[in-house]
């Protein structure tokens, strides 16, 4: 039977380097979780951090930046579910992740995540700032899970109130 325990970024990145098909280890994180069996062997790891997009509020949204497994059955679903529970306990309103358009997302769906959008993909490289591309640049599928609906509703009400005040209502 698999269980989830917290882990360090160093341990998580070592496993990402071994198992992840197309991304290198990460630089920063908020938390990382390890999926182990009854004798303590690791079968998967998830690293959760700030959203990559600057347009998304890093204090309200957590983002799964890496999830890697050795192929053990249900490890992905277990880790996605555990990451959402930890992010909820930390007070985040939602959690999100992006997967390749060639991946099914069945583990995310099994963990209660919902498909939200298709991103354009692309690269962070620009003429003014060339960057070496290491990851696939094709379209990505965005999945999210709402964690603290009351907090999300409160934020929406505050935004609506600010809009009414702006127009003198």
Q: Can you name each region flagged by the protein language model?
A:
Residues 1-26:
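Short amphipathic alpha-helix that is part of the acyltransferase structural core
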Residues 20, 24, 72, 88-91, ...:
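Secondary-structure transition/hinge residues
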Residues 124-160:
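C-terminal "cap" of GNAT-fold acetyltransferases
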Residues 157-169:
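Short, cationic low-complexity segments
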């Amino acid at each position: 039977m698999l269980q989830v325990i917290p882990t360090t970024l160093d341990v998580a990145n070592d496993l990402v380097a071994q198992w992840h098909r197309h991304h290198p280890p990460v630089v920063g994180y908020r938390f990382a979780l390890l999926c182990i069996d009854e004798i303590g062997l690791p079968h998967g790891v998830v690293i959760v951090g700030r959203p990559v997009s600057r347009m998304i509020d890093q204090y309200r949204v957590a983002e799964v930046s890496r999830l890697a497994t050795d192929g053990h059955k249900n490890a992905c679903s277990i880790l996605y579910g555990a990451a959402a529970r930890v992010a909820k306990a930390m007070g985040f309103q939602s959690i999100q992740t992006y997967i390749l358009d060639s991946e099914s997302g069945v583990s995310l769906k099994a963990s209660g995540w919902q498909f939200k959008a298709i991103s354009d993909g692309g690269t962070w490289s620009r003429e003014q700032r060339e960057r070496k591309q290491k990851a696939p640049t094709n379209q990505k599928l965005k999945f999210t899970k709402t964690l603290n609906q009351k907090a999300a509703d409160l934020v929406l009400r505050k935004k609506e109130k600010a809009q009414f005040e702006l127009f003198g209502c």
